[in-house]
Design a protein with these regions (language model features):
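Thr-Gly-centered strand-to-loop micro-motif
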Residues: 352-354, 411, 430-431
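Short, contiguous acidic/charged loop-to-helix segments that flank catalytic cores in large enzymes
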Residues: 330, 356-358, 384-392, 408-411, ...
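Long hydrophobic segments that form regular secondary structure
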Residues: 335-352, 369-372, 376
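Helical hairpin unit composed of two closely spaced alpha helices linked by a short loop
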Residues: 356-377, 382, 387
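Short, well-ordered secondary-structure micro-motifs
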Residues: 363, 390-392, 421, 433
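Aromatic (often tryptophan-rich) hydrophobic motifs at membrane interfaces
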Residues: 348, 366, 376-380, 407-410, ...
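N-terminal localization/anchoring segments of enzymes in phospholipid and broader phosphate metabolism
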Residues: 1-336, 341, 345, 385, ...
Length: 436
């Protein structure tokens, strides 16, 4: 009798556990197909299904990333600035505790957004603010570079002329010909007393920076961090930092699709040339990128000891720009939402450039709807791949794209690596996010 009672209690506890796990799955925010698959596994694979869900169905690492990143988010860095855009000395940052202040409100945001109301820009700007905490900014100058040699000549020139600080972040950083040239400049600047901090992605730069190279940086007092180093933790493989930025004296920004490697200049051994897009920007946007860099630095166990601008950068320039930073450590998929919004707002034309094209079902359907509604949709992807699998996967979408009237082109003059979207010749995106 006692054994029957014990068995009965075990059965009841197991049923309770199943109900708890099923409710957890239902409220997890996963897509419907994933939810149904896990519920079937839990119901029809006793015990094993629950163990599998706890081990594989819950993204524990992303939860930790979100908690860590929230403490040092770009928005919290920006929130330490003045409550208006008037020139005013920035308070000194000492610890993470100083991040806990009221959100920054820029007085000129409403005026700026009035300028872009005619093509739905206000809604796009608000979307980026609510999902990423960034603001529309005015900028005095920008230059685009489509040739790696010109882009890195500009970067090298600004590094040579740096007076206070150099902050660089790259998915791929190589200790090759270009990497050595950059290193020599950084070593000289370190001797001049500049604050220099570097972030390399733990996977993208894995095995690409020699020990001798790293030791020379350390010997010069140059700080560097690997973002989520994968050397000992394979579970981090999918959580990458794909950003590419150079910030000089908190006044000049270089960003775009180019990593730091010689092939971005000459195409390397595999390609005759490399087609990419990079930019040099001066203006208020630089402060936002600085906040992103600081956030990534703090999340990589870096100490908060930065040389920050003594005055909040204010520009009367005509170039309106806003940063969208997204990743596994953000609550909202800001970039995915931005792309969806841009596609649905289009009235005449959508132009997309990306080396890889593997859209999710939602964005694919929005592109098809746009084309079927008479909007011109043109997509350029790499014609010569550097990675075979995404190239082959992209081909599986061609029939659906072409049948809905979307034009698809393959770039043949080298490797296409730029990531751009232009909508109605009014709004464009340029950066480091592939369309996959």
């Amino acid at each position: 009798m006692d054994s029957l009672v014990i068995i009965s209690w075990i059965e009841h506890l197991y049923i309770l556990l199943v109900l708890i796990v099923v409710i957890t799955v239902l409220t997890s925010g996963k897509k419907a197909g994933s939810v149904m698959a896990w519920i079937f596994a839990i119901m029809f694979l006793p015990i094993v299904g629950i163990i599998l869900y706890i081990a594989l169905g819950v993204n524990w690492r992303k939860r930790r990333l979100l908690r860590s990143k929230f403490e040092n988010s770009p928005n919290k860095v920006l929130s330490k600035m003045s409550s208006d855009m008037s020139k005013r000395e920035i308070s000194k940052y000492d610890t993470k505790d100083t991040f806990n202040t009221s959100p920054l409100k820029l007085d000129n945001v409403d005026d700026l957004t009035k300028e872009i109301d005619e093509y739905g820009g206000r809604e796009i700007s608000k979307l980026l603010y609510t999902t990423g905490g960034t603001y529309l900014t005015k900028n005095s100058s920008y230059d685009f570079y489509f040739d790696g040699g010109e882009a890195f000549d500009s970067i090298i020139s600004d590094l040579e002329n740096a007076k206070e600080s150099i902050y660089m972040e790259y998915f791929i950083w190589k200790s090759d010909v270009l990497g050595e040239k950059i290193k020599d400049i950084l070593l000289r600047k370190a001797k001049e007393g500049l604050d220099i901090k570097l972030i390399f992605d733990g996977l993208g730069s894995f095995g690409r920076i020699s020990l001798k190279y790293r030791k020379s940086l350390e010997a010069a007092g140059i700080e560097f961090r690997y973002f989520l180093d994968v050397k000992y933790k394979l579970l981090k493989l999918n959580y990458r930092n794909h950003r590419k930025m150079v910030i000089v004296d908190s006044k000049i920004l270089h960003t775009g699709g180019m990593n730091l490697g010689q092939e971005y200049i000459d195409g390397g051994k595999a390609f005759d040339s490399w087609r990419d897009t990079n930019s040099r920007i001066e203006g208020e946007l630089v402060l936002h990128y600085l906040a992103v860099f600081i956030s990534d630095w703090m999340s990589s166990n870096g100490k908060f000891n930065f040389i920050l601008p003594k005055e909040i950068p204010v520009s009367d320039g005509d170039y309106l720009m806003q940063v969208s930073a997204s990743g596994p450590d953000t609550i909202w998929s800001s970039l995915q939402m931005l792309y969806t919004k841009l596609i649905t707002e289009a009235t005449e034309e959508i132009l997309i450039e990306s080396p890889y094209f593997v859209p999710d079902d939602g964005i694919l359907e929005q592109l098809q709807i746009a084309a079927l509604a008479g909007i011109s949709v043109k997509i350029i992807i790499a014609g010569k791949p550097d990675k075979k699998i995404p190239f082959w996967v992209a081909e599986t979408y061609f029939e659906d794209l072409l049948n809905s009237g979307i034009e698809v082109y393959r770039y043949q003059k080298g490797f296409l690596h730029c990531k751009n979207i232009i909508v109605d010749e009014k709004i464009s995106t340029m950066g480091t996010c592939n369309f996959d």
